[in-house]
Amino acid sequence: MLEPWHASVRKRQRQAPKFWWFDPGVARALAGTLTVDIVPRSTGFGRAFEHFVILEIVRAADYARSDFRFSYLRTKDDAEIDLIVERPGRPPVLVEIKSTERVEPRHVRDLERFLPDFPGALPLCLSRDPLRRRIGDVLALPWQEGLAEMGL
């Protein structure tokens, strides 16, 4: 479960959490979509990839026995940060997850929009793109390398 992020605990409690199953296959089974192929570049593939990456980050943090807190942020106009990783004594990590094989500036616009609200935060775009590069203030890199950037 990912709690919604807000600086105010009271406002955080009024927003709905996101639920993630321990295995993306369980979610597909419950949705009755196990026999439906997940095709790259589809909405279903993007959702499954985001689910998978979030689970890998949470599992790595659990394995490392870190005290990281995980949340997400969605505004009333549906701008979203897929994952906010709060690390004790260190700046937070703002994570955008994209299933694309080529990250483009349009993929990180929402993330860049939130940066003034999180001074000092580490903005990452994790994807299937094999190249590591900067896009504006955002570090775009393969999802596996993102775990190391977070300290996992």
Protein language model regions, located:
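Short beta-strand/turn micro-motifs composed of small residues
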Residues: 74, 125-127
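Short, charged, amphipathic alpha-helix that recurs within catalytic cores of restriction-modification
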Residues: 100, 106-119, 123
